[in-house]
Amino acid sequence: MMKSNQSTVSEFILLGLPIQPEDQAVYFALFLAMYLTTVLGNLLIILLIRLDSHLHTPMYFFLSHLAFTDISFSSVTAPKMLMNMLTHSQSISHAGCVSQIYFFLLFGCIDNFLLTSMAYDRYVAICHPLHYTTIMSQSLCVLLVMVSWAFSSSNGLVHTLLFARLSLFRDNTVHHFFCDLSALLKLSSSDTTINELVILTLAVVVITVPFICILVSYGHIGATILRTPSIKGICKALSTCGSHLCVVSLYYGAIIGLYFFPSSNNTNDKDVIVAVLYTVVTPMLNPFIYSLRNRDINGALRKTLSRRLCSH
């Protein structure tokens, strides 16, 4: 712990999840199962898309990158949380904390841009079907992913460098299960005005703008469906956009609940629980949402399994 009211720190203490000590073993088993499901489920989607040529389309190109990002995003926080629960240790080094901040922001930001790219892909597929292959070219898809990585890397680097310059802290006890930037800034006795201003500014670009783009895309999709109302058209739109809408609702629902309805108490238990939703639960559910009732994914899985069985 800290020896004075203001000093430098070499490590932080992560208080973890708001659970009783006697329940640690149960929650460890639960979160380990969820993390393994996240990794294996998303890896399966990546492999199926790579192995089946019928899935080499813009939609599945973005989905494979989203699956990789989900694995990475969950891996930033879950292994350390599980290790702390297993060893009953709560410490993380200052360097480890800085690294966690960077990669958390990196993959979280990429998630936003990939979901936006997928919404645009669905918009073009439904609203401009005749020009779909021309608009959604391979070069555009690669460019969108590259821009997502470049901007997300810059965003994470800016926040990380601004945090690293903070030298004095009133306390080193973090009321979270990972190094959450907002929770860490509350502990600093240095001036965090610039940090908070940059967070607000970049949050508009990273969260608000992509969310608005997604809403606009689905607004146009809805208008297109209403102009040509038919059971077949509605079913096609639902099968095409339903899974993506579910993922967007889960992801942005958690973010809106966390940042637009913040906790009024100091323990921030609600913030920790909501963080579990978008760092552990949502990445785990995404493979099930995208594969459930998805004939292309299910067909690719059956084809791959039958090939493996026949080879033996």
From Swiss-Prot:
This is Olfactory receptor 1J21. PROSITE patterns: G_PROTEIN_RECEP_F1_1, G_PROTEIN_RECEP_F1_2. It is found in: Cell membrane. Keywords: Cell membrane, G-protein coupled receptor, Membrane, Olfaction, Receptor, Sensory transduction, Transducer, Transmembrane, Transmembrane helix. Its main location: membrane. GO terms for cellular component: membrane; plasma membrane. It is a multi-pass membrane protein. Odorant receptor. Activated by (+) and (-)-carvone. GO terms for molecular function: G protein-coupled receptor activity; isoprenoid binding; olfactory receptor activity. Belongs to the G-protein coupled receptor 1 family. Gene3D superfamilies: Rhodopsin 7-helix transmembrane proteins. The keyword Aminoacyl-tRNA synthetase does not apply. The chain crosses the membrane at residues 29-49, 58-78, 95-115, 143-163, 197-217, 241-261, 272-292. The keyword Transmembrane applies. InterPro entries: GPCR_Rhodpsn, GPCR_Rhodpsn_7TM, Olfact_rcpt. GO terms for biological process: G protein-coupled receptor signaling pathway; sensory perception of smell. The gene is Or1j21.
